[in-house]
Amino acid sequence: MSTLGHQYDNSLVSNAFGFLRLPMNFQPYDSDADWVITGVPFDMATSGRAGGRHGPAAIRQVSTNLAWEHHRFPWNFDMRERLNVVDCGDLVYAFGDAREMSEKLQAHAEKLLSAGKRMLSFGGDHFVTLPLLRAHAKHFGKMALVHFDAHTDTYANGCEFDHGTMFYTAPKEGLIDPHHSVQIGIRTEFDKDNGFTVLDACQVNDRGVDDILAQVKQIVGDMPVYLTFDIDCLDPAFAPGTGTPVIGGLTSDRAIKLVRGLKDLNIVGMDVVEVAPAYDQSEITALAAATLALEMLYIQAAKKGE
C-alpha cells in the first residue's frame, strides 16, 4: 500500500518544502528520525466551512518565518541539535475516498511507530485524529488524551466520517481512557456524562496557567498521552482561518504557555488540525498553528536534553 509520494507526484497538495524548511524525506521509515511530520490534506468530514485540506500547505509555508531562530526564545537551545525531525510530505490517497484516507493514514502511522519513530501530524479536519489514535493504541495501548478545542467532538450522530465524533468513538474502541483525559478550551454544548474532564474556556481564561497544568498532570498521570490541538481552541481574533470558529477562546499566548507546560507528560503522538487558510487573515492562523507545532517539538527536545 503506497501512502507517501515523491517529488514527481502531482497528487500531492503541499510538498514544495518541509516544515521549518526541512528537506522532504519520502522514505521516513528507514530514516534516523526521532519525529516525523506528516501532512493529511483531508476535509471531507467537515461540518462547517471546508478548506482544511490546504492546512498542511499553509502551516509549512508560514513556518519559514520560524526557521531562522536557532536558540528559540525562551528555550535558549536549538531544537534541531537535540531532536532529529523529518518531514515526509503528505499522505497520498484518492481524494473523495474518506475510507481510503483513514486506512492509509493508519497504515502509515503503524509503519512509522513500528520503526521506532514518533509522529507530529498536520490536518486537515479533526477526523484525521481517529485513524492516528487507532495506530498509536496498537503500539502504546490505551492512552490519555489531552485535547485543545472549542468543541468536545464527542457527538454521537451515527456518521462514520465526521470531525465531531472521534472522541465518542475512540473510548468505545478502547483507544483512550476518558477518565485520564482532559479537554481544554471547550465553549460549546457537550455531554457531561462521557467521562472526560472538561476545562471550559471560561475556566481556562480565568484561572492561572500553573493551576491548570497541575490539574492536567494529576488527571493524566503517567499514562501515554496523545496531544491534539484543534486551532479553533484559539479565539477567532487569533485564529480566524478555521472551519468552525467560536468566540471567547484562548489567546495565542495562553495556548503556548499551556503547551510548554506539558513537557513532563509522556507524550507519544501529536497533531495540529483544522487550519483552513481560505478564511485566514495575514496568515495569522497558520502562524499560530506552526508556532504551536514548533513548541510541541521543543517540549520533546527539552525532555531529550535532560
Swiss-Prot record:
Necessary cofactors: Mn(2+)
SUPFAM superfamilies hit by this protein: Arginase/deacetylase
Catalyzed chemical reaction(s): agmatine + H2O = urea + putrescine
Name of the protein in question: Agmatinase
Pathway as given in its UniProt record: Amine and polyamine biosynthesis; putrescine biosynthesis via agmatine pathway; putrescine from agmatine: step 1/1
CDD domains found in the cross-reference section: Agmatinase_PAH
InterPro entries, per the entry: Agmatinase, Agmatinase-rel, Ureohydrolase, Ureohydrolase_dom_sf, Ureohydrolase_Mn_BS
GO BP of this protein: putrescine biosynthetic process from arginine, via agmatine; spermidine biosynthetic process
PROSITE patterns linked: ARGINASE_1, ARGINASE_2
Job description of the protein: Catalyzes the formation of putrescine from agmatine.
Family assignment from sequence similarity: Belongs to the arginase family. Agmatinase subfamily.
Positions contributing to Mn(2+) binding: H126, D149, H151, D153, D230, D232
Gene name as annotated: speB
Organism: Salmonella typhimurium (strain LT2 / SGSC1412 / ATCC 700720)
Transmembrane segments: none
Keywords, sorted A to Z: Hydrolase, Manganese, Metal-binding, Polyamine biosynthesis, Putrescine biosynthesis, Spermidine biosynthesis
E.C. no: 3.5.3.11
GO molecular function: agmatinase activity; manganese ion binding
Stored HAMAP family: SpeB
